Amino acid sequence: MKWITPASLILLLHFAASKALHENEFGIASTLDSSQCVTEKNVLSIATITFTQFVPEATEEEVNKMTSDVLAAMKKNSGDGCLESQLSVFLDEICHETELSNKYGLSGCCSQSGVERHQCLLARKKTAPASVPPFQFPEPAESCKAHEENRAVFMNRFIYEVSRRNPFMYAPAILSLAAQYDKVVLACCKADNKEECFQTKRASIAKELREGSMLNEHVCSVIRKFGSRNLQATTIIKLSQKLTEANFTEIQKLALDVAHIHEECCQGNSLECLQDGEKVMTYICSQQNILSSKIAECCKLPMIQLGFCIIHAENGVKPEGLSLNPSQFLGDRNFAQFSSEEKIMFMASFLHEYSRTHPNLPVSVILRIAKTYQEILEKCSQSGNLPGCQDNLEEELQKHIEESQALSKQSCALYQTLGDYKLQNLFLIGYTRKAPQLTSAELIDLTGKMVSIASTCCQLSEEKWSGCGEGMADIFIGHLCIRNEASPVNSGISHCCNSSYSNRRLCITSFLRDETYAPPPFSEDKFIFHKDLCQAQGKALQTMKQELLINLVKQKPELTEEQLAAVTADFSGLLEKCCKAQDQEVCFTEEGPKLISKTRDALGV
């Protein structure tokens, strides 16, 4: 984002280099301190998470051995009951295991040292390896037996299995899920209907796991792509909306620390991620009387639940009597004469005030508003007529809000009219045109997530559509960009993903079609029909139809609605005829080629 200067909104550079430093060069205090007393109880689960996320291919036995070894090494270097907690201790252990290092291709990273070794090992964490199978909860009877025999081993196995499949999920989130699952097992093993109890409660945990992992990976990807500056800006917005009663001094302090914690978590520094998160939550609860009246119930919870509760608590309400007039916010000061540091602090204070007076606006919309606001200030300060130049300022800022609200209304109207399946088909056509290089499975998964956004957000009251939609779309687009980072899709998607974080959604929305895409030669293999179409039901049949739709659009991206309707009608006719035939396979063999020929003639392919 151009409006954030190289010095960054909240300078975190010196603080990130040393935990012992409690103020940055702006004199912003920190809620954190340099004390890191780590006990054996802390280390066991954290070591499992750290080793498993860095080496997800490792077996549970290999991870347990590294955990045991690193704990012994920590104890040896400690004389006061506080164990050494530097990330390097864990990385040393990974590389010390030569057999493991060679077995899993770590020797290249382990031949390096310090920051280089750390970054090399981090680069391997981009995705969970294909060799790791999807996670499956054990059968209820098996779970109850194992949990009763050795609760600690059972829960450590859960932490291991979750960590290896979610390499970017923050340690506190994994531990919170583990605590929830522990309670589920205890409750369901005593229930009359164990199967039903486990099925219901596990579904909730699986949903939280999926959403939490996606969010954490998205944040880490944004930091990796855009650096800490965007993170600091979004942190100011989120904190100001959540803690609307807090003054700017408190928000600066918390933004500094929360942004730093995100970076620790994304660097794989699970111990500091956990401990510093606890310190910030403790501070927030100790100051709740001046920060927010909405977190009182959260602050009564155990630490393992506290963070999740505060993060998911409702945003605050706009303080009574507080208003913001953007055209008067600068006053009689000359923005052009501000130093870079003064501009940073001024824009940070604008973000704070605008966010706390608009607690329900999407974060991305506020980022766009701030970008436009600074651009107008820069231009008007140069004109010499600041008051007159700002006449249309509020109109220009309001356009961002109106665009987001209009899109959310349009999307929810479509969802309410079409329903899940037809809306997904509409998205499939659009995204196959934008990204025809993606596989059918990727496109179906991607558009399925879009339908999930609509089904979640459009159930809310209309004033919440925009905030919900923009927030979920940010994560959805973020994961498209993570896919693009791993293997570039096309130049249009790359441009949207890389040029501006705040404008990603706008860019993807306006990118209608990859004009560089050349359809492949027509292949009848993609349009062969068999009797399994008659046997397929529900989701399986829908997927088969959607794969056909994707192949049609890939073959002819400019496919019109009329052409699509005609092909769909012909295909439905084929299904009806052949599924009633005495020999379905013979019917498809005879009639299928006729449909393909008719379709090719109609589409000119």
Curated annotation (Swiss-Prot):
Keywords: Copper, Disulfide bond, Glycoprotein, Metal-binding, Nickel, Phosphoprotein, Repeat, Secreted, Signal, Sulfation. Residues 19-207, 208-398, 399-597 form the Albumin domain. Glycans are attached at N247, N498. The modification Phosphoserine is found at S107, S111, S113, S340, S440. SUPFAM superfamilies: Serum albumin-like. Plasma. The keyword Metal-binding applies. It is found in: Secreted. Its main location: secreted. Binds estrogens, fatty acids and metals. This is Alpha-fetoprotein. It comes from Mus musculus.
